[in-house]
Amino acid sequence: MDLRDIDLNLLVVFNQLLLDRSVSTAGEKLGLTQPAVSNSLKRLRAALKDDLFLRTSKGMEPTPYALHLAEPVIYALNTLQTALTTRDSFDPFASTRTFNLAMTDIGEMYFMPPLMEALAQRAPHIQISTLRPNAGNLKEDMESGAVDLALGLLPELQTGFFQRRLFRHRYVCMFRKDHPSAKSPMSLKQFSELEHVGVVALNTGHGEVDGLLERAGIKRRMRLVVPHFIAIGPILHSTDLIATVPQRFAVRCEVPFGLTTSPHPAKLPDIAINLFWHAKYNRDPGNMWLRQLFVELFSEA
């Protein structure tokens, strides 16, 4: 069809319905009445010859064709919005903006202290809120702007997202300094004989450790499994268990909990830690500023 047959305002309504899945909510956010939104949807359906959204018990569900249109429409509207607002600026020292960042507990331990120290000097009124990448629907939350940036190994963030490599995690074995039998460098035989504490970190690269070890024919004597890395330090401090952890995490635990590390006896691949943001906010001045700060503070490149 010819682009001249489409009213740009109809695409704005389409985009809002994609985000809210509700005619009334979309109308409220756009400053339109519910009948006006319904009429816009009717016109767009006629122009595109598709229902686009179907009313269900869960709200207005997009059709396959609507989902096919979603990314290019969102990208086009965002590009146009950026072009119209290029004069906007971001003053970090004066800003009171809250940035929502998705990361694991390891991410909080590694990223937050240097980030908050830098913000205290450069952006004293900015607030940071963190959440887990698997706490909800991360793709939708980043598309809607509810989450500004995500950090980690997040293979689900592909189409519609930009990413920047920060560094690579190397795995090590960690245990208490006065462990009766664990030594560095640790052999595969010793690694297999000792008892382990493991972390089930779903939807992160760290959740692949068991699979990597099994494919290498290495079995762990798993004594304890926990859902968060944050518990590993205190547990190793008071037990004879050992753990497979990222090296940067180990550095933060060694002194506070009296721990030490050994190069990992298994040839585990490094884990790439990337910074992700949605294409809609690629030119958002505040998002750009915070991304650059992360690169400055944490990038190995």
Curated annotation (Swiss-Prot):
May regulate the expression of the naphthalene (nagA-F) and salicylate (nagG-M) metabolism genes. The keyword Iron-sulfur does not apply. The gene is nagR. Keywords: Activator, Aromatic hydrocarbons catabolism, DNA-binding, Plasmid, Transcription, Transcription regulation. Gene3D superfamilies: Periplasmic binding protein-like II, Winged helix-like DNA-binding domain superfamily/Winged helix DNA-binding domain. It comes from Ralstonia sp. This is HTH-type transcriptional activator NagR. The lineage of its organism: Bacteria, Pseudomonadati, Pseudomonadota, Betaproteobacteria, Burkholderiales. SUPFAM superfamilies: Periplasmic binding protein-like II (SSF53850), Winged helix' DNA-binding domain (SSF46785). Residues 23-42 bind DNA.
